[in-house]
Amino acid sequence: MNRRAFFKRLFSGIFVAKAFPLLGKEKKVPYSLTTHKVASNSWKEQNLIGRVVIAKDLNIPSLEAELRSKRVKEMILEGVKELLAAPSIPAAWKSLFSPSDFVGIKLSCLAGRQLSPHPEVVDGIVAGLRLAGVKDENILIWERTNRELIGAGFTINTSKKGVKCFGSDALELPYDATLQFAGSVGSCFSTILSTYCTALINVPVLKDHDLAGVTLAMKNLFGVIHNPNRYHDNNCDPYIAELSTHPYIKDKQRLILCDGLLAQCHGGPSYKQQWAWNFSGLIISQDAVAADAIGADIIEKKRKELNLKPLKEEGRAPKYIATAAGLGLGENRLDKIKLIKI
């Protein structure tokens, strides 16, 4: 039996059911997710390789909560408009999403409340989706576990009313029964991505990673598979890049919005206050490779400012970014990336 056949048998439906026994018992979603197919790939006409927007406002940290939320929402809506060079904010969002879409907003909440996507950032994304005609009931804020979402300050909503918010572990079947391959990565995908979502919005945080160098858009997608810990050797290269070649990601990921309101240049992926700073910005793109390249450059510059060694000298250069570019997933050369600052 070859390796691929072995793993397919190993991760059969029976194995998956036995591998996640507690998840079924701790089920919090009182219904099964409906299967939705991607109706159209017309949005790919807007897919702008090598184009990145940085929306930044240094006044963000000093604003009161209501004004801060309003300003962050403006940055998101205007940032997507500038990214797509659209004639208006509604036109920009309508070019990416339609009322028939079921949208998963994949967060990165491993580091807890201090260094996870801010609720006001997610609120701004939801506002954009509403402009595109997406119903609240068709929007799902999502992470690996309910615990991570709660720890980051989000409220779980498993009802059929309003914007949903829950982890893969809240489902009776959190991961597919069938093993999928993407290069050397063999994993079962979250059913939220494989079954429910027709569109994916990737919301990482601007921070470093002790093994991969940085954990940004592409690394955040380790949270959509059941066995990410298997793929951390060699600075997670080529695994991070290869995972993004899978159709579930390649065909559904429509927007990357990296939360850099608070960023971290050392000690990640967990929160380390001494290495965090107010970048006060958002990185917005459709090109995950370009977004990661820009994010890594920001982190390297901050490290230099603080007299920290370059990531390469610490043995954790984010090699996966160049690998992803080599796979045709996007642009990693900084001098070729069209960077728009607003």
Language-model features: locations:
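N-terminal and secondary-structure boundary signal
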Residues: 1-342
